[in-house]
Amino acid sequence: MPTAGAPPITDAFGAIAHPVRRTLVTELAGGDKAVSQLAAACTVSRPAVSQHLAVLRGVGLVSEQRHGRERRYHLHPERLDEVRKWMHTLDRFWGDRLDRLGRHLEENP
């Protein structure tokens, strides 16, 4: 259940729809990183990485902390819980449907 004030699940889906943002989320899953470290893992410029991070920040997937002149980013994976729950529901739905189809095809060759 989303918490009060949390961006809706569609925002999280939109944020992770872009391949660069998925790369950033994957990189941050390994721990906090600076923009320069994240840019090295991507095929886009540092300013583009910063723009993608702003989208992720906007939906609460990442937060930013300044350490001197460096900005470090932290992943908040709990924001993906609603996405994971929704995908699990679909997985169960389609799993059940495909199981029934398989049984039907075995019984009616």
What are these regions (language model features)?
Residues P2, P7-P47, E70-D81, K85:
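N-terminal helix-turn-helix DNA-binding core of bacterial DNA-binding proteins
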Residues G5-P7, D99-P109:
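Short, charged, intrinsically disordered terminal tails
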Residues A40, Q51, R57-G58:
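Alpha-helical residues within the helix-turn-helix
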